[in-house]
Each structure stands twice: as C-alpha cells, then as structure tokens.
C-alpha cells in the first residue's frame, strides 16, 4: 500500500512539473498526467480498473454539473446595448490605469469607456484607436458573479467586412465565432507591445495591407463593438448554440451546452 501511495505521489509531482514548462507539448502531457494520476488513485487503492476509469472521467464529466444546474438556466439579452459608463474602481480592476498607460504609450488614443450589464454579468470596455494603422484596441473586464478576469484585444476591420482580431482571451470562447471574424489567440503573459507586434504579423501573414483596412471615425467605434456583440448572438442563434426565450432574451440550447463542454475539454489540454 505504501508503494502505491509513493507511486501516486511521484506521478502527481511529475505531472505538476510538466505543467510548469512553457512548451505546449509538455503542458499537454501534464494535462494527461492529471487524468493518469486520477486513474492510478482509483485503481491502486481499490484494485478495480473500472473505479480508476471513473476517477479519471470525473475531470471530464464534472463540468456537466454546472452546465445542467446553472448555465442551462442563464439568460442573455438578444441585443446587447453598449452604454457609456464610468470605469470600475481600483478595488475591482487595479490594473486598469497601468494598462491604459501601456496602450497609450504605443500610439493609441483613448476613445471611450463603455459596457453592458445583465443580471449578475457585467462587461466593461476601455476603447482606443490608432488612426495611422487603422487598428482599435480594447482593455476588457468580464465580471460574472464571483469570477472576474480581463483581457486585451486588437482589431482591424477590413473593407470587405472581415474583422481581424488578436487577443489574449484566457479561455476558449463561449460562443461560436461569426464567419467574418478571424481570431489570433496569443499567450496571456505578453505585454501590450508584444501583442501589437503579433497583430501586425497576423495581418501581414494574411496579406492585409493598411489600404485594405477601413478607416474608422473614433466616435463610431463603440457602435461597431455593439454591432459585433449582436452579430455574435445572431450567428449562434442560427447555429443552434443559443435558443430564443421570448422576444428579448436567449439561453444555451442542449447543443450549446455540448459546445461549452467541448470548449472545456480544449482548455484542459491547451497552452494558455
């Protein structure tokens, strides 16, 4: 029995060590190691491979508890409306001033503070624009119940309607991306300058020269962001991820819950 405990602890320590490396392959091995540790715990302590598999599968099936009991009941507005709003306090978003300075140091002009609220869900956007490169930037805060996180994004709008976005959103996105939206997801530990350089490389890779980008009126940017949010909801209604609830609300369908679960599995092994 002692040998079994030592083996389990050894595999766990090796797994945690793998997760500390920055290499994607080692990170994914570490994620598989979590499943292996759970399997060994069940198998070695009971002698049953079935219990071992049950312990390992708990990591994969546990999200369904939250999906069925909470997410399935959530509603969202069918048409999200951005409004001007004051920035959150330092106790809510202590990094906002520092991030703002970092964005402005790279040639961006602060355009507006906007956001939308729905029940326990709040989203705040600090919007910027750099006219010479026709690129908009945003510092975004998502606050839902007891969970809050922020991310940075850079977007360039092509004249053909395609939106090219580079961001460090920390999770797999909870909605299907609209067909006209091309996303380049990068690591969360990049500075804004590194994010900006990555966005430039993203545009260059796809042959998007500055003259192919739409030049925006700064005052129009909040309306464009609102338009993007509404387009996402409309696309996911059409895809069956969301379903209407009355005339003004939507919620996740069973297909949508399955989509969220698959997104969770992607996050389980993805380098973030």
Short names for language-model regions:
Residues 211-272:
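A eukaryote-biased signal for long
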Residues 47-125:
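N-terminal topogenic membrane-targeting module
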Residues 1-81:
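N-terminal alpha-helical membrane-insertion module
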Residues 1, 22-24, 130, 140-142, ...:
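Alpha-helix initiation/capping motif
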Residues 53, 168-171, 185, 258, ...:
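Short, isolated positions within intrinsically disordered regulatory regions of eukaryotic proteins
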Residues 49, 59, 64, 116-118, ...:
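A residue-identity detector for tryptophan
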Residues 93-237:
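Structured extramembrane domains adjacent to transmembrane segments
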């Amino acid at each position: 029995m002692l040998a079994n405990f030592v083996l389990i602890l050894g595999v766990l320590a090796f797994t945690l060590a793998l997760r500390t490396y920055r290499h994607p392959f080692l990170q994914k091995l570490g994620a598989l190691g979590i499943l292996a540790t759970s399997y060994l715990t069940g198998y070695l302590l009971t002698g049953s491979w079935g219990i071992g598999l049950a312990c390992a599968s708990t990591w994969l099936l546990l999200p369904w508890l939250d999906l069925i009991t909470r997410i399935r009941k959530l509603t969202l507005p069918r048409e999200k409306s951005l409004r001007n709003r004051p920035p959150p306090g330092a106790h809510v978003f202590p990094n906002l001033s520092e991030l703002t300075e970092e964005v402005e140091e790279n040639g961006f002009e602060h355009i507006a503070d906007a956001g939308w609220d729905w029940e326990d869900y709040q989203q705040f956007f600090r919007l910027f624009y750099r006219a010479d490169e026709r690129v908009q930037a945003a510092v975004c805060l998502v606050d839902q119940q007891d969970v809050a996180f922020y991310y940075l994004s850079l977007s360039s709008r092509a004249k053909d309607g395609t939106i090219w976005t580079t961001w460090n959103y920390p999770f797999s996105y909870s909605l299907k991306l609209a067909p006209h939206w091309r996303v380049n997801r990068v690591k969360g530990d990049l500075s804004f300058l590194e994010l900006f350089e990555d966005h430039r490389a993203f545009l260059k890779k796809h042959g998007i020269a500055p003259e192919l980008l739409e030049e925006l009126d700064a005052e129009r940017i909040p309306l464009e962001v609102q338009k993007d949010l509404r387009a996402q909801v409309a696309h996911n209604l059409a895809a069956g991820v969301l379903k209407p609830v009355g005339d003004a609300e939507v919620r996740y369908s069973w297909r949508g819950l399955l989509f969220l679960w698959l997104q969770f599995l992607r996050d389980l092994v993805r380098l973030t």
